[in-house]
Amino acid sequence: MARMTVKTLAAAVGVSPATISNAYNRPDQLSAELRDRILATAKELGYPGPDAAGRTLRMGRAEAVGVLLSERLSYAFSDPFAVEFLTGLSEVVEAHGISIVLMPLSTPTDGSRTRPNADDSDLTAVRNANIDALAILSLPTDHPAAMIARARGIRLVTTDISSDPESAWVAIDDFGAGVMVGEHLARLGHRDVAVLVETNQPAGSPGQRLEEDQLGFLDYAARVAGLRQAIGGQVMIISGGHNSIESGATATSWLLDRDRIPTAPIPTAPTPTAPIPTAPSPTAIVGLSDVLALGAVQALASRGLSVPAEVSVCGFDDITAAAAANLTTIHQPIREKGQHVGRLLLDPESQPRQVLLPISLITRGTTGQARQQPALS
């Protein structure tokens, strides 16, 4: 069977090729009756519609927006935060007849979550993407994929605060959120806190101690900095591995099993006059996502440890499961964040271009007065 074209469809309907083009690209130029007849005939004859790439060249727009995800697509579909964000974004974008192209990043092979290899196939996808604008979820604006998009003239919208006055972003005050959590725990007497973070560092399997410069997410680094400032005590950063309940539980189990982690180099021959400096076991665990925090609660319960009597637990994001688990957490309007990003993607003139969303501490049943040391066992 011959391939259907604009000309063959036009001949079948009895109109010009220009009228067929208007039916798809400028429907306001036709009567509803004529457009319906054209679309019905196209469906009957198997005409797929105008070529998207060709239409982009002619009209200067692709009628599609992209979302650059910091993880594989299979993970994004299981992440409550990503699902809620994409729901909000799609509600706005699809209402205007615009398509969404999801562009997940593979796990980096060089050990850096935010710096995939320059020849990565992910970057090729961005080079070839037929999109008008790109949302960048939890990645820096100087990420190679973002730089490629910018060089192509594609508008960018990020979900992290940028110092660039010309940039478009929708974010929360992550540093302020960390301060909120830190002040809440400090009021309860907590001075020794463990923080579970998602990471893909080479040593980033659940249960590895990290430094702040190893944090891949900008929002995570800001939250830890705010927490550390407010606590004024010992803040230990622990890799939670991938963002999952299982990883949070594994990291917490490692924390409970460790033999009082040294905080300074161990002398080659310890003596009574040169003891090994140690860190007290934390009285609180903060998951920088609710998912990791829920894993911590699960691990503590499996050891017969009471939350919050023996260990307090706090999360971030306030996903639906957090309320069900009575988890103390930072609430951020995830769905609203996606909606704001969608509006900025659609309209380059939309104001304001920089949206700081409100946050609040939701105090529930997993935080309480700090227990008296000694360390857990």
Short names for language-model regions:
Residues 36, 48-123, 130-133, 228:
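Amphipathic helical "hinge" segments at domain boundaries
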Residues 10, 136, 287-288:
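Short beta-strand scaffold positions
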Residues 1-64, 371, 377:
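N-terminal helix-turn-helix DNA-binding module of bacterial transcription factors
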Residues 249, 258-268, 281-377:
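Flexible loop/turn connectors
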Residues 108-121, 202, 257-283:
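Intrinsically disordered, low-complexity terminal tails and inter-domain linkers enriched
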Residues 137-176, 201-203, 291, 317-327:
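Flexible loop/hinge segments that line or gate small-molecule binding clefts
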Residues 72-84, 102-117, 140, 170-180, ...:
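Hinge/beta->alpha junction and helix N-cap segments in small-molecule ligand-binding domains
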